[in-house]
Amino acid sequence: MSDNSKTRVVVGMSGGVDSSVTALLLKEQGYDVIGIFMKNWDDTDENGVCTATEDYKDVVAVADQIGIPYYSVNFEKEYWDRVFEYFLAEYRAGRTPNPDVMCNKEIKFKAFLDYAITLGADYVATGHYARVVRDEDGTVHMLRGVDNGKDQTYFLSQLSQEQLQKTMFPLGHLEKPEVRKLAEEAGLSTAKKKDSTGICFIGEKNFKNFLSNYLPAQPGRMMTVDGRDMGEHAGLMYYTIGQRGGLGIGGQHGGDNAPWFVVGKALSKNILYVGQGFYHDSLMSTSLEASQVHFTCDMPEEFTLECTAKFRYRQPDSKVTVHVKGDKAEVIFAEPQRAITPGQAVVFYDGEECLGGGLIDNAYRDGQVCQYI
């Protein structure tokens, strides 16, 4: 049996149950474990309570319980520069970004990893539901978490081979109820703490109010694809392709009671396009273009791949053909797909393995670009 005590693992601890159990398992396996709390956002709420302070107290309590040293590190500047500025720029461009993908790439597995190495880390570990397996030649492959409902490889798809080489995901082989049970059996103070929801820097806040603090809203016309005026929208940034709620038009226009959906945006004219029916023609596409395409293992500069893909988190896989050229890709769908959204991640899979992914730039319907931005 190998002696893990000489291997230092620095754990990103958020104050939640997943990262608490991650630290616990590594400690039980004999590793030299250090807990780190990352403060990425100044999130004082309207009552003057900073939730990060409460979360850090939970980290301290758990670290003391399991007997590991802990530190707090401030990445607010890195987060603002590398994640939040990107988030705002994407909304300005009419797209719908996924900040969690960028946060993992730039903060949790870059800024945090760099910091952990200064502490002598051999590995970093997080509470993500994913798995890493190492080939005999040392190549690391990332697999989906065993808990299909919690699998987070979609958000980890931009990680590089170098980052994965230094990473452990101790929860990848567990289901969420098992993690809670382990926390309860160990008497961890976070055992019953509810999972955090929403974008990390918004949390439970009203998204519209939050965004309007940083980007001025520009109301404009809401129209059908064939030019019927449907009233006013509150600002293109508040709507995403395929969205149903928040349009304020219901079944009031015409006799058809089918629900209304956002089917497109014209950024230059500040028009929001809407249409009736979940599978409205304007929501369906047959291919997409992606940039910032990246694979977790070394791949040729140009190649074609038959695999499956996800276009949003918790979506079933769809069969695709991917034509890759440098960091760009054309992704052709075996079956038409609904509400492909510029700014979101497209992530590629071969069975259990997450191969990598990219960011969606445009959707196409039979060769014609969809008017999504």
UniProtKB/Swiss-Prot annotation:
ATP binds at G12, M13, S14, G15, G16, V17, D18, S19, M38, G127. Residues 98-100 are annotated as: Interaction with target base in tRNA. It is an enzyme of class 2 (transferase). Its EC number is 2.8.1.13. It comes from Streptococcus pneumoniae (strain JJA). Catalyzes the 2-thiolation of uridine at the wobble position (U34) of tRNA, leading to the formation of s(2)U34. Disulfide bonds join C103-C200. It comes from the Bacteria. Its main location: cytoplasm. Belongs to the MnmA/TRMU family. Coiled coil: none annotated. Pfam families: tRNA_Me_trans, tRNA_Me_trans_C, tRNA_Me_trans_M. Residues 150-152, 312-313 are annotated as: Interaction with tRNA. The record marks H128, Q344 as: Interaction with tRNA. This is tRNA-specific 2-thiouridylase MnmA. One of its GO terms (cellular component) is cytoplasm. Gene3D superfamilies: Adenine nucleotide alpha hydrolases-like domains, HUPs, Translation factors. GO terms for molecular function: ATP binding; tRNA binding; tRNA-uridine 2-sulfurtransferase activity. It catalyses: S-sulfanyl-L-cysteinyl-[protein] + uridine(34) in tRNA + AH2 + ATP = 2-thiouridine(34) in tRNA + L-cysteinyl-[protein] + A + AMP + diphosphate + H(+).
